[in-house]
Amino acid sequence: MNESYQPTLIEQLAQEYWEENETFEVKEDLSREKFYCLSMLPYPSGDLHMGHVRNYTIGDVIARYQIHKGRNVLQPMGWDAFGLPAENAAIQRELPPAEWTRKNIKKMRKQLKQLGFAYDWSREITTCDSTYYRWEQWLFLQLYKKGLAYKKNAIVNWDPVDQTVLANEQIVDGRGWRSGAVVERREISQWFLKITDYSEELLKDLDELKEWPEQVITMQRNWIGQSQGVIINFNLEKGPDKLQVYTTRPDTLMGVTYLAIAPEHPLAKERAKKSKKIAAFLKKCKQTRVAEADIATQEKEGIDSGLFAVHPLSKEKLPIWIANFVLMEYASGVVMAVPAHDERDHEFALKYDLPLKPVIEPADGHDWDYNQAAYTNPGKLINSGSFNDIDSKTAFNVIADYLKNNGAGSRQTHYRLRDWGISRQRYWGTPIPIIYCKTCGTVPVPENQLPVLLPEDIIPTGHGSPLKETASFYKTRCPVCNKPATRETDTMDTFVESSWYYARYSCPDQDKVMLDDRAKYWTPVDQYIGGIEHAVMHLLYARFMHKILRDLGLLNSNEPFIRLLTQGMVLKDGAKMSKSKGNVVTPQSLIKKYGADTVRLFIIFAAPPEQDLEWSDSGVEGAYRFLKKLWGFSYRIKDALLAVNQQKERSNYQWEAPEHRQTRQQIHECLQQANIDMERLQFNTVVSAVMKILNILIKLTTDNDAEAHLIREGTGILLRLLSPITPHISHHLWQSLGFGGDILDTPWPRPDPKALQTTELELIVQINGKLRGRIQVPTEASKEIIESTALNQENVQRHLADKKIKKVIVVPKKLINIVV
């Protein structure tokens, strides 16, 4: 053992030991309790950033802690390798995305290994490998057979110059990020997964997720968006057709003064054929982004269609307007407008001089100026004929029943959640296994022809779809009639890959089936770690896919992740680290200067996992100083500890002196609190406990046999508490100080109940309920001794002067109250 702390050397030695001994490669073992710890897999950008390091350090602390607790721990790592960023990088560098991606993976794998994470690298997966996406294509075929994968028209952001679909973040001021062309809303045929079939179960099973952050549960609940409402039929004034409207406020039905339909509604398209003004308006609407948030905040605009609908109750004529704020994807693309009781409808009505008809007044009867603002709260019905004077809640049921009895509507449970559009008009993604034949129509690729391989030698240009221009890919033969046919050139949303990867880690070597029984052993994931930004999309899709895999008989649980931790961001100067802000700190430079253990220790100590972490150079220096202090202490006590560790009776040592028992009590109290905090994932306070223990031990001397044994016990506790956080130095010191074997094979320390037993208690002394002092008494002191000690306390005597004691109340082991 060197006198000076040399992190580069000891970290290299520890990592070589783990690799040579396959320390973290695990097998299924039904005789042991399993623990599956997983951090969200990274996109291989080429460089680890501090956000990665924090995420994976937290996960590694949890995994190593569970190893110490004797569990069979799986902690794998892989790469979310498909997607737009790789394609964009390839366009800029004029090289195939496959080449760019695999080079980045190689670099990032090396960086992860430098940090000493306890990953089972034998299970590594890369989502752009055909051995992985083959099973994704197989899964798509199963969904297609069950009617859960289907194709329909949907609205997208279309770049007319690059001839491609754009994500919302690729649009800058209404123009394509590359071409600068004005982006259009275009309707194209796309593939969807029927997640809405699972809406009710996805909502209900949120109640099972007792160890998820409440914020995430709320976000998912709102995204699924269950509401109870009514479908109302509005017949068109002319002809047999009708418009169906979904509303959660049937109590406002008598206040409808117009209907609004989406620009993509068939009725709007039909009217555009007969009106140049309407056609021009629809064209203008196409230049709006498809994101719901953008549509909600844009200026409300519309045009009169010239058509009328008939109110189902009053039989009044209602004008039908085409409005840019109505979403075709929500309900039926028709809104019943009640401007007196809806802010958006109110704004639109004032702009286009449409009538307002108040039908609800405040329940307390105070006046409301409906021209100034919509009254949106429940209240009492007015101007509603036979429904007058009833409250909104009652009116919901009364009007819903009336509509049903008169064939004009029906109750409906509605979900905000829409089916998952998985088509991407991109190259770098999983090919959708579908063939189009002029004779046979849409034909799924036979399972024995999987995988449909993505050509990896393409250099995308950013113009159009590369797969449509690659004849060797899209030209094929129909598997049914053997005539010439074409392949689907859309690829799958990368959220599909990340919706089931956690299960594939259980059996990445399986080439006969998607998942085998090992998946049932390892899933669900016991602890999942990732950012709050994935609260809805990724986590919801993974929950959906887990239920699909369960229904296919491949898994036997309802939910993918038992416990979820959403770690905070890493900030510098109050802002998230980013290249554009110039506030990035690279992990590699810190590892080179201080070592991986210092980086890990700072990350863990600087903030609780769920809170944002403010970067501090002095904090990193402080972590490094602590590890040097630990090393120096260990070097000083090494010879004494080696000697003590060779004694046969070292584990049964009895401390007689009160000062030694008190010191031991302090150490075990720190351990007790650290264990509580480990279970609560409050690792920063575990580090605080370790620092306290080291400060206690440093004051002891190895010249005294009792203290040498105390140092041995305390150091053994300290190193095991640190082992998940700073594994390299803990591994090295454990062996160098003669504790024997691999520290990871040793059980997690538990406080000794005898050490925690105290010989004295501190009691609060009150006079008439007010704190007047504290006393120390033996733990087994009688009521009489407690009373006597309290009454003789100097401050108590001062407050008792000239007062008569009525009674003395002793609350055992807590307080004594003197009533005067």
Curated annotation (Swiss-Prot):
Chain span(s) of sequence motif 'KMSKS' region: 576-580
Catalytic activity field: tRNA(Leu) + L-leucine + ATP = L-leucyl-tRNA(Leu) + AMP + diphosphate
GO molecular-function terms, A-Z: aminoacyl-tRNA deacylase activity; ATP binding; leucine-tRNA ligase activity
Subcellular location: Cytoplasm
The enzyme's E.C. designation: 6.1.1.4
InterPro entries: aa-tRNA-synth_I_CS, aa-tRNA-synth_Ia, Leu-tRNA-ligase, Leu_tRNA-synth_edit, M/V/L/I-tRNA-synth_anticd-bd, Methionyl/Leucyl_tRNA_Synth, Rossmann-like_a/b/a_fold, tRNAsynth_Ia_anticodon-bd
Motif mapping: 'HIGH' region: 42-52
Name by which UniProt lists this protein: Leucine--tRNA ligase
Species assigned in the record: Coxiella burnetii (strain Dugway 5J108-111)
